[in-house]
Design a protein with these regions (language model features):
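Non-transmembrane, aqueous-exposed alpha-helical and coiled segments at domain scale
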Residues: 1-192, 197-291
């Protein structure tokens, strides 16, 4: 199956706009679950406002949030897919620029030193593009995640040592959620990366934060720790928008990697309540959009 750059460009454009407008079904279901279980009156009111915002965005074909975020594209290439990797990256950038200028969208991307905004949602190394491979035949998947600054500004890394054990990981994650408070626009998805090197650990935390609700860590011990941490975080009383309540997080997600015998890095990356993402899947039958 051959994929032309123009197809990727159009998908990149469409995905950015879709991600900013339509919340995935698993996040909507997460809101319904929290709204049903929340016992604090103020928190329940805040959740109601968030749910109403989702409805208004859908009914009026508007954005879910004013923050268009840092555009992240995760590309997964299956077997028997023919494409030009360099051309694909350029096509994604063009699609991102077109979405920003044609819609138009607010560009949130600036030069890190001069703070100059090119009004394209693009810049040095942005959009962020990750490319990986899968065993699926004749399939190309492109996931788009617009990562907002409230959640991204509250990212943490600790180079723990093995002697501190799992309890140190739990304490660190809980402390990070407390430190973030309402700045991440909770309820959040708390992504936790454990193991690897510092850079891999942070990447794992981001991957965990953008996983669909209801998914579990593939490792049985990791999945058990997810459940314990989710319970611990939701006992903190941070609540929606940091105003108190039971609903601090939709879930805690964990991704693991093997690490050095003298290391045990742990990273936290959170996703705000507007946990936006969109996906395009190319097959011989065409392109299908979803989440």
């Amino acid at each position: 199956m051959k994929i032309e750059p123009v197809q990727v460009e159009e998908a990149a454009r469409e995905l950015y706009i879709r991600a900013l407008k339509m919340l995935p079904p698993d996040i909507k279901a997460g809101f319904a679950r929290l709204d049903k279980s929340e016992t604090d009156a103020t928190a329940k009111s805040v959740l109601g406002t968030m749910i109403a915002n989702i409805r208004v965005a859908e009914d009026t074909d508007n954005l879910l949030c004013q923050d268009t975020g840092i555009p992240i594209y995760n590309v997964l290439i299956g077997r028997d897919v023919e494409l030009d990797g360099h051309a694909i990256k350029a096509a994604i950038r063009r699609g991102c620029e077109r979405a920003t200028r044609d819609y138009p969208l607010r560009s949130s991307v600036v030069h890190p030193l001069t703070r100059r905004n090119e009004h394209s949602s693009c810049g040095i190394e942005v959009p962020v593009i990750h490319i990986d491979f899968s065993d699926l035949p004749e399939t190309l998947s492109i996931e788009m995640v617009p990562k907002g600054s409230g959640s991204e500004n509250n990212s943490f890394l600790r180079m723990a040592i093995p002697a501190e054990g799992v309890d140190a990981i739990k304490t660190f994650v809980v402390d990070c959620v407390i430190a973030a408070g309402g700045k991440t626009c909770p309820p959040t998805i708390v992504g936790v990366g454990i193991g690897g090197t510092s850079d891999l650990c942070i990447a794992l935390a981001k991957r965990a934060a953008t996983r669909p609700l209801g998914s579990r860590c593939a490792d049985v011990d990791g999945a058990a720790l997810e459940a314990r941490l989710s319970a611990a975080v939701n006992q903190l009383g941070v609540g929606p928008q940091g105003l108190g309540g039971d609903s601090t997080a939709f879930a805690v997600h964990i991704e693991l990697a093997a690490t050095h015998i003298t290391m045990n890095p742990v990273a936290v990356n959170m996703q705000c309540h507007s946990a936006r993402r969109a996906r395009a899947t190319f097959t011989p039958a065409g392109v299908a959009y979803g989440f």
